[in-house]
């Protein structure tokens, strides 16, 4: 088992949920957390515990974003007009690695981060290798022509576990995707419930 797969399995087990909706998630086989104490009965979480869990789940879903970087996203969301929780989701969905994942150019968010970092992706015709780069409405994200026959990319096109959401306009033949608009929370195809307002409460303590 690769380190990335092991990391994904650990996140699923810790959350007790199949947060990416994968058929091979260990949560499909058992409902306790990782480690030797994972089978112990869990007590009721405090308000802080519920908020912390919501934050960990959202961070984990987007590839285990580091705390410093995730807090930076929250701060930016709080500065924007409108609901901070909705803004947080909008900023996370604008990340280049998230768009690459949503467009099904690669099979996982972890693979998307590495794929971008290795220079396989262009935005509006220019190579961008920063996974946290924020895509703007109308931007076109595409796989470099030289990278389109990679096994990782070809396999991702065959995945049936998830669909491309409506706010991503996909040209499958060219492996190009236009970021049409910033989505509402209920439009984002999370396999499990995400609660960004609890994340806001966590950071607002």
Curated annotation (Swiss-Prot):
One of its GO terms (cellular component) is small ribosomal subunit. It comes from the Bacteria. Residues 94-157 form the S4 RNA-binding domain. CDD domains: S4 (cd00165). Keywords: Ribonucleoprotein, Ribosomal protein, RNA-binding, rRNA-binding. Coiled coil: none annotated. One of its GO terms (biological process) is ribosomal small subunit biogenesis. Residues 18-46 are annotated as: Disordered. Pfam families: Ribosomal_S4 (PF00163), S4 (PF01479). One of its GO terms (molecular function) is rRNA binding. Belongs to the universal ribosomal protein uS4 family. Part of the 30S ribosomal subunit. Contacts protein S5. The interaction surface between S4 and S5 is involved in control of translational fidelity. One of the primary rRNA binding proteins, it binds directly to 16S rRNA where it nucleates assembly of the body of the 30S subunit. This is Small ribosomal subunit protein uS4.
């Amino acid at each position: 088992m690769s380190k990335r797969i092991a990391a994904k399995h650990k996140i699923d087990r810790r959350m007790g949920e199949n947060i990416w909706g994968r058929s091979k998630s260990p949560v499909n086989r058992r409902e306790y957390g990782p480690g030797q104490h994972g089978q112990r009965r869990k007590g009721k979480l405090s308000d802080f515990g519920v908020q912390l869990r919501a934050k960990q789940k959202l961070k984990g879903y987007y590839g285990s974003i580091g705390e410093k970087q995730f807090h930076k996203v929250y701060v930016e969301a709080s500065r924007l007009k409108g609901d901070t929780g909705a803004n947080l989701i909008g900023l996370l969905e604008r990340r280049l690695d998230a768009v690459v994942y949503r467009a099904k150019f690669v099979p996982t968010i972890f693979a998307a981060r590495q794929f971008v970092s290795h220079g396989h992706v262009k935005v509006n015709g220019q190579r961008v290798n920063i996974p946290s780069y924020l895509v703007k409405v109308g931007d076109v994200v595409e796989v470099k022509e030289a990278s389109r026959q990679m096994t990782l990319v070809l396999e991702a096109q065959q995945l049936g576990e998830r669909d491309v959401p409506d706010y991503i306009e996909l040209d499958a033949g060219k492996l190009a995707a236009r970021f049409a608009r910033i989505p509402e929370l209920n439009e984002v195809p999370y396999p499990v419930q995400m609660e960004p307002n609890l994340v806001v409460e966590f950071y607002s303590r």
